[in-house]
Amino acid sequence: MEYIKKIALYMSVLLLIIFIGGCGNMKDEQKKEEQTNKTDSKEEQIKKSFAKTLDMYPIKNLEDLYDKEGYRDGEFKKGDKGTWTILTGFSKSNKPGVLDDEGMVLYLNRNAKKATGYYFVNKVYDDISKNHNEKKYRVELKNNKIVLLDNVEDKKLKQKIENFKFFSQYADFKDLKNYQDGNITTNENVPSYEAQYKMNNSDKNVKKLREIYPITTNNSPNLKLYIDGDIKGSSVGYKKIEYKFSKDKGQETTLRDYLNFGPSEGENVE
């Protein structure tokens, strides 16, 4: 009888040791899974944050933004319907030390249903003492067409401005949720969040960019989704898309896109 009791006690202790060890392993696995989930969830949060605006792409008629409202917070004054800011810029280096940068900025005021902005032409030098040559040409949006308000004698430039299309007018991100294994960088103190994906030259957005811009490199680009501010939404921060085709010195080639909703400024508020 004593022998049976000893065997039973031994088995109980053995099972307890196995159970504790098993719990320890389970906890380790749970920690690993939780850590993985945190990384995955952060990537998903970044994509979901961008989806709030990217789901609207392509915005073929920019004036549709007058009827669309973005994220609102306490920064908005009473009665302010807000203003959409849209930017597309393309920069390319044709020789070391100099970057040619061109693009357009447009402010679509939902209070006045008026859109004004400018086309910019700039040369950015490594020697910062030379960086005082940006030219701006005022524009407005009428019937979904860019109207040039300044006199431009260069016919080629004039045509380029009047026929300009923002990236958001032809880009399509319906597959955004399927982007996987992004390189995620976060800084909770700023806060800022970044997801970077290696794209393929067969991607429809990449192909469209190659049709429109003088992209000479055959490199497939990296797509960067960058958030400055609260990942859940903020009128103070901003979100930026960037396609970097080359970062080699003297061959830098980048397309950047920006669409954000924020408070209207001064006289823009009714």
Swiss-Prot record:
Listed Gene3D superfamilies: 2.50.20.40
Lipidation positions, renumbered (N-palmitoyl cysteine): C23
Localisation: Cell membrane
Signal peptide start-end: 1-22
Cellular component GO terms held in the UniProt record: plasma membrane
Presence of keyword Membrane: yes
Cross-referenced InterPro entries: Csa, Csa_sf
Record key words, sorted: Cell membrane, Lipoprotein, Membrane, Palmitate, Signal
Covalent lipidation (S-diacylglycerol cysteine), chain numbering: C23
Topological type in the membrane: Lipid-anchor
Keyword Zinc-finger part of the UniProt annotation: no
Similarity-based family: Belongs to the staphylococcal tandem lipoprotein family.
Protein name: Uncharacterized lipoprotein SAUSA300_0419
Organism: Staphylococcus aureus (strain USA300)
